[in-house]
């Protein structure tokens, strides 16, 4: 099982919970009590920060990297694995048609990189809204997020990976 619960990096109490402190999370989010109480416990629970992995290039010569090695992102949007799978499928399609491997890899990255980069940026932004928002204006976030969630431009931005249709 995998559960992703985030807290600000500055929240030492949230980060250092080993094991997971159920009561702290229920106190912070009482509306989710029923879900927190159903979480299975595991003796190896731990907190780790997430990092975006951004490479200047996904390939060199006849070698490439895919998935988290090329563009790791925090699971804020739940898109990392899907993006990696789509990248691999597109890569296989291009390699099946193109004999020049370095050229195929360049074509693949040119095709996939724009939507991957945008997905990564939106994942970071979504996480930052949740964990880096200034405490002094949390009430603003609480009013802003419901409005944003109804805006088409926000929804399209969050769905960039879901809506991606590979050209290859």
Segments predicted by a language model, with ranges:
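Alpha-helical structural elements of signaling/regulatory helical domains
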Residues: 31, 97-100, 114, 132-136, ...
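Short, structured helix-loop boundary elements
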Residues: 19, 102-105, 137
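C-terminal auxiliary extensions adjacent to catalytic cores
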Residues: 142-168
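Conserved mid-domain beta->alpha element of the FAD-binding
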Residues: 44-125
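Conserved FAD/dinucleotide-binding core of flavoprotein oxidoreductases
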Residues: 1-47
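Crotonase-superfamily enoyl-CoA hydratase/isomerase domain that binds
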Residues: 121-138
